[in-house]
Amino acid sequence: MLDSVQIVLVILCSIFIANYLYLRWSSAAKRKTAVEMTEAFENQDDVSTAIYGVDHIYDDFYAKVYDQVIDGKVRQEVETHFTLDWAKSFRPQAKTIQVLDVGCGTGGHVDLFRTQGCGKAVGIDLSDAMIRQGRLNHPKADLRVGNAEVATTFAADEFNLITMFYFTYYYLKDRDSCLRNIFLWLQPGSCFVVHGVNREKFDPILEAASPFVGFSVQKYSKERVSRSKVSFDKFEYEADFQHEGSDAKFKEEFRFKNGKIRRQIHSLRIPTMEEMVAEIESAGFSFKKYIDMTSIGYEYQYLFCFVR
């Protein structure tokens, strides 16, 4: 016979499992995409498997599915809130926030900055396709194709807050030039906020593949789980994160119903957190604090806050 405590535990477990199954079913049913399979391949005739390196990944196809794959709306809202809260508390004398988001992707953060009272909110990204999609998603946001490694992209002292979210720092090819330009574009005493991770411990599972927002499977697994799987209406998606030291690969695969496969390989350089702070400080910035994102389920992920 089960005692009352055991009965309650069984009921709670049953509710949890039922909710989990319902959420997974309902979210899968809603994962409809606006893309056509033909958009995923440059050559439609004689290619069954296409492999894209980091310089060619962010095309029209990927731009259209990016937000659904990453599923980062909650994360963007919290990162924007944390960043503005710190910037305003650190510089209460600033009448308005003039923010630049480097590597803005489809512009989610930029639009949130705009709606939260920033006097100026600009986003730049190297990808034409991501900017085009971002303008469709957020028609009022100021999104531009631009390169942070080019000093003339903006004027000196144009911003008092610059951000790099969602692994952008790890994609940079010429970090020295980029940091030098950010230092130039920021007004003296202004803020620079960078997303960073503990590469050994952070959860690489995409939000779309997690059962609940902010839920990490790593707590309940003896070995690190690195593979994400998500079902969409036109393809099956799978991703895997691996690293050896600072060299990391994020591999994605789209399997279409006709048997064609699109594979993508993101190459990143992920230094230790101490090394990242040292790199940024060597460009003239002062490290002030980090904001731990564990409170929203992103363990071992942080917003590093610097001042010019």
Task: Report each predicted region and the residues it spans.
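A short acidic, Gly/Pro-enriched loop at the edge of an enzyme's catalytic core
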Residues: 153-162
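Conserved class I S-adenosyl-L-methionine
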Residues: 21-94, 96-103
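C-terminal lobe and adjacent flexible extensions of AdoMet/dcAdoMet transferase-like proteins
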Residues: 269-308
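A short glycine-rich, Lys/Arg-flanked "PGG" loop and its adjoining helix->strand segment in the class I
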Residues: 176-191
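SAM-dependent methyltransferase
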Residues: 196-277
